[in-house]
């Protein structure tokens, strides 16, 4: 009771907010809120409170109440950060140049391979407790630092343990196509075969993932490879999410829409064609400004996207090397 303002009231039950409607934020001043069995049951102004039986009464004393943050793009499970690469960045090397030198994702994969599942879980739980304390109530966590069947499954099992251990809503995404493993250098097609024919069936057999993701961008996976992986995943009941257009206009947006992806994420490199492709689509553009800031890249054209009537989601891209 005695809440100065409840922010983010949505009484119509809509699941999607786009364009100019994103500027309409429902609020209620001088309010009370009733929770039952972990869910909000009722709310109203203090002058309508009346006599409500409650096991516990919390006096907000004029505080404000905000929804928890839904962080829909993270890489929280990893074995140590890549702080040494920050020196490369400030000395002028790009993300792609660091990756070509064996850094970036491949660096994280090497370290994860040497780390046990229990240690990965312990490290990740520290990060989960940190984001929960800062207001995150729902989080998506990706694999993608394994790049082998065994290590990808290890990551996803850690995510499952996290889901079973915390009150947050946790969703798991299989990202075996984050980069081509060192063992498959020069044999990218064979690595895509591995993802489609071995990794995906193993992930599905254990029920370890809610979604599948592909890094569809210059120097990583092509549109054709992305479509093949996503179609294989769909047959196993996994819906798509895509890393797209971070480094170049890659075609990732268009293949995401064509494959009915839940979201296309990053989008630092967007043109009119990409914005038009998203108009009327179910696919949600997701922006990761922390990564753009850390990497010294241009921010995605959020205002142009909203003015075109698109919905825009924000996520942290919490990861060991670029956000």
State what each model feature region is:
Residues 1, 56-59, 70, 173, ...:
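Hydrophobic/aromatic beta-strand patches that form the interior of the parallel beta-sheet core
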Residues 3, 33, 38, 62, ...:
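Divalent metal-coordination and catalytic microenvironments
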Residues 56, 60-123:
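Metal-associated gating/positioning segment near the N- to mid-region
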Residues 67, 129, 227, 231, ...:
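Alpha-helical segments flanking ligand/cofactor-binding loops in enzyme cores
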Residues 76-77, 246, 320:
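Short active-site segment of divalent metal-dependent hydrolases/proteases
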Residues 239-240, 249-323:
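Active-site-adjacent C-terminal substructures of enzyme catalytic domains
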